[in-house]
């Protein structure tokens, strides 16, 4: 399991992704500003964990192919279609000598299908899901997400839920994941939100509206 963390939450009209920004090699800390959430199109984004070279190369390959599809057909693939293409590509590479060690969460918004969040593991298995995570930190967040997620979740509550998860990770995980970047995609497109870090984690302010 990767010494990284990515989390995803789907709401009624949006999807939110969060990831730590730490880059490490074995037990060596390299830097703390590595972005792991990548823009695939105006309404699709992907968070990845795994081998550093594999995540960059594979994400770039998927992004370029989705852009080529847009040029060829005049429209972007929906999150569901993009997830299917990504899953198939990853599964095909498993059957060759060029296997990518990468797992991901793919999030998107479509005017017809609405918001969509897909969990894709390193073996090419994919599942549409309401909340998910990859990496060590996600082990501490599953019960939190199951308890507090609901189908009417607002963006503000989803962000508070992300902060609750990050706080639990920083309490219990020996690995120092001190900074998390957060992105949301909805009918207005993909945009970056305020990062979650020790400076923004005021324990008293983390409250949910239900």
From Swiss-Prot:
Parts forming coiled coils: none
The keyword Amino-acid biosynthesis is annotated on this UniProt entry: no
Membrane-spanning parts: none
Name of a matching Pfam family: Proteasome
Gene Ontology terms describing biological process: proteasome-mediated ubiquitin-dependent protein catabolic process
Cellular localisation: Cytoplasm; Nucleus
Record carries keyword Cytoplasm: yes
Keywords: Cytoplasm, Nucleus, Proteasome
SS bond partners: none
Superkingdom, taxonomy of origin: Eukaryota
InterPro entries recorded: Ntn_hydrolases_N (IPR029055), Proteasome_beta2 (IPR035206), Proteasome_bsu_CS (IPR016050), Proteasome_sua/b (IPR001353), Proteasome_suB-type (IPR023333)
Gene Ontology CC annotation, any one: nucleus
Family classification: Belongs to the peptidase T1B family.
Subunit structure: The 26S proteasome consists of a 20S proteasome core and two 19S regulatory subunits. The 20S proteasome core is composed of 28 subunits that are arranged in four stacked rings, resulting in a barrel-shaped structure. The two end rings are each formed by seven alpha subunits, and the two central rings are each formed by seven beta subunits. The catalytic chamber with the active sites is on the inside of the barrel.
Function recorded in the entry: Non-catalytic component of the proteasome, a multicatalytic proteinase complex which is characterized by its ability to cleave peptides with Arg, Phe, Tyr, Leu, and Glu adjacent to the leaving group at neutral or slightly basic pH. The proteasome has an ATP-dependent proteolytic activity.
UniProt xrefs under PANTHER family: METALLOPROTEASE TLDD, PROTEASOME SUBUNIT BETA TYPE-1
Protein's UniProt name: Probable proteasome subunit beta type-2
């Amino acid at each position: 399991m990767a010494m990284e963390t990515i989390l995803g939450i789907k709401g009624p009209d949006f999807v939110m992704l969060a990831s730590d920004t730490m880059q490490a090699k074995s037990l060596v800390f390299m830097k703390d500003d590595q972005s792991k959430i990548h823009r695939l199109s105006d309404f699709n984004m992907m968070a990845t964990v795994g081998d550093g070279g594999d995540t960059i190369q594979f994400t770039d390959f998927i992004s370029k192919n989705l852009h080529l599809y847009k040029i060829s057909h005049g429209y972007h693939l929906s999150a569901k279609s993009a997830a299917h293409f990504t899953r198939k590509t990853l599964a095909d590479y498993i059957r060759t000598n060029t296997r990518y060690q990468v797992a991901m969460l793919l999030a998107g918004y479509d005017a017809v299908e609405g918001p969509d969040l897909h969990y894709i593991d390193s073996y090419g298995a994919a599942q549409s899901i309401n909340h998910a995570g990859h990496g060590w930190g996600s082990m501490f967040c599953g019960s939190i997400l199951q308890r507090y997620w609901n189908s009417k979740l607002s963006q503000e509550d989803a962000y508070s839920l992300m902060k609750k998860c990050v706080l639990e990770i920083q309490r219990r995980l020996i690995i120092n994941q001190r900074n998390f970047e957060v992105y949301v995609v909805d009918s207005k497109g993909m945009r970056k939100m305020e990062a979650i870090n020790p400076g923004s984690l005021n324990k008293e302010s983390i409250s949910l509206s239900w």
